[in-house]
C-alpha cells in the first residue's frame, strides 16, 4: 500500500466519524431543547461517548503517521528538521488533542453549589459539550494547516461543509447551555471554532488538485509562527480559565496534577468536595438551614 493510499484511508476515517459526530450532536441539541425524550438523550449521550474513543484513536493514528512520514523523509533535514513549521504544528496538534480528551473524559460535569433556597449563585457548570472537545482539535488542525499550505482540494471543501454543520450544532448546544445554566465555556470554545472556520474560508481557492500536506513551507516565514502561536494561545487561555473555575477549591499543586491523565482522582475530588457554606448554619428550630 502506497503512502497516498494510507493517507486516503486516514482521511476517510476522519470524515466518517466527523459526520457521525454531527448527527449525534444534533440529536443532543434536540434532546436538550425538548424535554421528555429520555431515549433520545440516552442514545445521543452513549453514542457520543463511544465516538469520542474512536475519534481519539483516529487522531492518534493520523498524527503518528504524519510525524513518521515527515521525520523519515529524505528532505527532513533540508527543510529545517524539527524547527520546520509543519513539524511544530503536528506537535501542537497532538498536545491540543490530549488536552481536549482530558477535558472530555476527566473533568467533572458539575461542581456542587449551595442550595437554591440560599439565593446564592447556581452550581457552576463545566460542561464543554462533547462536540466542542471532538471538533476543536479537528478545526484547529485543518484551519491552521491551511495557513501553512495555501492549497485546497475538493476533499477540503467536503471537510469544510462538515465543519460548518459541526459549528451550527455547537452553536445550538452553546446557546442552550448558556440560556439554561449560564455556562460561557462552550460559547468560548464555539468562538474558537468559528474564528478558525473564518480563517479557513479566507484561504479557500479554486485549486481542486488532491495534494498532501505541504511540507515545503519556508522556516523563515514569521507569519506562520505567529498564526500558530496566536491560535494556540487563544485556546490555552480558554482552557486555563475554565480549569480555574473547575478547580478553584484545590491547591496549586493539585491543580497542576489535574492537567495530567494521572489526575483523575484530583478531578473527582473537585467534583465530590463541596465548597464551604458561605453562611453559618442556624442551630435549633425556628429558622431555615443551608444544606
UniProtKB/Swiss-Prot annotation:
Principal place of residence: membrane
GO CC list: membrane
Keyword terms: Glycoprotein, Membrane, Transmembrane, Transmembrane helix
Source species, domain of life: Eukaryota
Claim: Transmembrane helix is one of the keywords in the record: yes
Region (Disordered): 269-291
Membrane-related topology note: Multi-pass membrane protein
Positions of transmembrane segments: 13-33, 40-60, 81-101, 128-148, 158-178, 220-240
Compartment list: Membrane
Glycosylation site list: 249
Name of the featured protein: Uncharacterized membrane protein ECU08_0540
Amino acid at each position: 500500500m502506497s503512502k497516498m493510499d494510507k493517507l486516503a484511508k486516514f482521511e476517510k476515517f476522519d470524515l466518517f466519524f466527523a459526520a457521525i459526530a454531527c448527527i449525534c450532536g444534533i440529536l443532543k441539541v434536540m434532546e436538550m431543547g425538548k424535554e421528555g425524550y429520555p431515549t433520545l438523550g440516552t442514545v445521543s449521550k452513549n453514542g457520543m461517548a463511544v465516538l469520542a474513543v474512536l475519534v481519539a484513536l483516529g487522531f492518534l493514528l493520523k498524527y503518528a503517521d504524519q510525524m513518521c512520514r515527515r521525520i523519515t523523509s529524505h528532505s527532513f533535514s533540508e527543510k529545517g528538521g524539527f524547527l520546520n513549521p509543519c513539524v511544530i504544528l503536528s506537535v501542537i496538534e497532538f498536545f491540543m488533542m490530549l488536552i481536549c480528551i482530558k477535558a472530555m473524559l476527566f473533568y467533572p460535569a458539575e461542581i456542587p453549589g449551595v442550595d437554591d433556597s440560599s439565593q446564592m449563585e447556581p452550581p457552576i457548570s463545566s460542561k464543554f459539550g462533547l462536540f466542542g472537545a471532538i471538533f476543536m482539535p479537528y478545526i484547529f488542525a485543518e484551519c491552521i494547516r491551511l495557513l501553512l499550505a495555501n492549497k485546497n482540494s475538493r476533499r477540503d471543501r467536503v471537510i469544510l461543509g462538515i465543519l460548518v454543520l459541526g459549528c451550527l450544532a455547537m452553536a445550538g448546544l452553546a446557546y442552550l447551555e448558556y440560556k439554561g445554566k449560564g455556562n460561557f465555556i462552550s460559547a468560548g470554545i464555539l468562538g474558537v471554532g468559528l474564528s478558525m472556520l473564518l480563517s479557513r474560508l479566507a484561504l479557500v481557492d479554486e485549486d481542486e488538485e488532491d495534494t498532501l500536506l505541504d511540507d515545503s513551507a519556508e522556516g523563515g516565514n514569521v507569519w506562520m509562527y505567529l498564526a500558530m502561536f496566536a491560535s494556540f494561545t487563544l485556546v490555552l487561555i480558554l482552557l486555563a480559565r475554565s480549569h480555574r473555575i473547575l478547580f478553584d477549591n484545590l491547591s496549586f499543586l493539585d491543580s497542576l496534577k489535574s492537567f495530567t491523565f494521572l489526575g483523575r482522582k484530583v478531578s473527582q475530588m473537585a467534583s465530590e468536595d463541596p465548597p464551604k457554606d458561605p453562611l453559618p448554619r442556624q442551630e435549633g428550630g425556628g429558622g431555615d438551614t443551608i444544606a
